[in-house]
A protein has these predicted regions:
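Enzymes that bind and transform nitrogen-containing heteroaromatic metabolites
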Residues: 1-187
Length: 187
């Protein structure tokens, strides 16, 4: 079981543009071979964590608050937020705040032998990293630059560096990069 940050990024390191839009990314959804990438990944996930900005983006773009059947995920989801957010009835969405470590322990128990997916914002992922809880970073790198926006991972990770586990190109414009997060004792 791993705690994984699975996301897409521009080559200049942004996961959303300065308007919090992902429209730049949608042009890559039809790349040959990509149709199985996300379903393969999501089949390994037993729990999800996201921040409030990601939760609100999903709510705005899917309408699941009015129609809970539009919520795409079938596993328990933890939303980290310091403020009250709208909720949808009948979904296993848990709202939490504060330290990620005790919530991570709960997620591990619920996920059993499956992975934990950290969705969206790099700051929340950074909190997991800072506590030694992040195991892998999986990035779909798109061949565009955004110039500004939401950063991929607003942390300085240089010693030890991430370990490249694999790189899979999809066409000429997109590559999936998979990294292991090394612990200081592993170098």
């Amino acid at each position: 079981m791993s705690t994984q940050y699975y996301t897409a990024s521009s080559i200049d390191g942004f996961i959303a543009d300065s308007d919090n839009s992902l429209s730049w990314l949608f042009q890559f959804s039809e790349l040959s071979g990509m149709e199985d990438e996300f379903p393969r990944f999501i089949a390994t996930v037993g729990a999800i964590a996201m921040g409030s900005t990601t939760y609100e983006w999903i709510a705005d773009h899917t309408g699941f608050l009015a129609e809970p059947s539009k919520w795409e995920y079938t596993v328990p989801t933890w939303v980290f937020s310091s403020r009250d957010l709208p909720r949808a009835d009948g979904l296993d969405i848990r709202f939490v705040s504060g330290d990620v470590a005790p919530v991570h322990q709960e997620m591990l128990q619920v996920a059993e032998d499956r992975n934990i997916w950290l969705v969206g914002g790099g700051d929340l992922v950074g909190q997991f990293h800072d506590q030694g809880l992040l195991d892998e970073v999986i990035i779909g790198m798109a061949s565009v630059t955004l110039g500004s926006g939401a950063p991929l991972l607003p942390r300085r990770i240089v010693t030890p560096p991430l370990q490249l586990l694999g790189a899979t190109p999809y066409g000429e414009d997109f590559v999936m990069l998979r990294y292991a997060v090394r612990r200081t004792s592993e170098t």
